[in-house]
Amino acid sequence: MLVVLLTAALLVLSSAQGVDEEVVYEDSSQQLELEQQSQGHGQHHPKPPPGGLPPRPPASDENGDGDDNDDGDDDGSGDDVNRPERPPQHGGNHHHPHHPPPAAGPQRPPQPGSPQGPPPPGGPQQRPPQGPPPQGGPQRPPQPGSPQGPPPPGGPQQRPPQGPPPQGGPQRPPQPGSPQGPPPPGGPQQRAPQGPPPQGGPQRPPQPGSPQGPPPPGGPQQRPPQGPPPQGGPQRPPQPGSPQGPPPPGGPQQRPPQGPPPQGGPQRPPQPGNPQGPPQQGGQQQSSFLWSFSA
């Protein structure tokens, strides 16, 4: 690349120098044409007799500006070469145009040459573009390749999405499963409610049972009465007493009323119950009652 740029710079400089030289050639050629035209007009008649003597060209050179000779010997030599043509063709003015064309001809080649010179720099510029295009070309394959390259990563990305879908699929089963999972806890909750109901059930029995709890202290008083009836022979009361056995849960309240009546008038049942055997507990109470009455 550096070499190409250097060559391009040299070509540009050379083309610039060529343009300058062409400008100088154009100036000198124009001056020569003017001089030749002036000489042609002033020496048309003298030229034919001498037959194109060489001294006349020197005279023309002397009359001409020395700068023209200084500007370029090539121009002077060209004048010498073209000057023999002047005498035979009294229309040397036309030859001088022909002579400038040679001088202009070099200019024209340099001009196309200068374009050629710049084109090389332009060519290098095109070459760098060509260089990048190769790079761009690689980029294009890489671009399709890079899509291919990324697609593998992109494919993994799609695969991860596929991975998540399995995960999402598990999630879906878990979602129904999670409801199922919660239902088990919910089932335990229901079971727990079922557990509390047993507990609540116990509470309900305890609620009626709590009367049973109090009745037992009052019930022992009743039980001694029950005890006496079996001993007293009234097996019939035990038959209704068996209902009374079940009623304890349902009818302990009746027993408490029965308990208070014994308490209200316990002495009468205890009196028959005293001789019967459970007077131990009931007897103590009756003794307490007797003491109270005696007091």
UniProtKB/Swiss-Prot annotation:
InterPro entries: Pro-rich. It is found in: Secreted. Its main location: secreted. Residues 26-41 have a biased composition (Low complexity). SMART domains: Pro-rich. It comes from Rattus norvegicus. Contains glycosaminoglycans of chondroitin-sulfate and heparan types. Transmembrane segments: none annotated. This is Proline-rich proteoglycan 2. Residues 1-16 form the signal peptide. Residues 48-58, 100-187, 194-278 have a biased composition (Pro residues). Residues 16-295 are annotated as: Disordered.
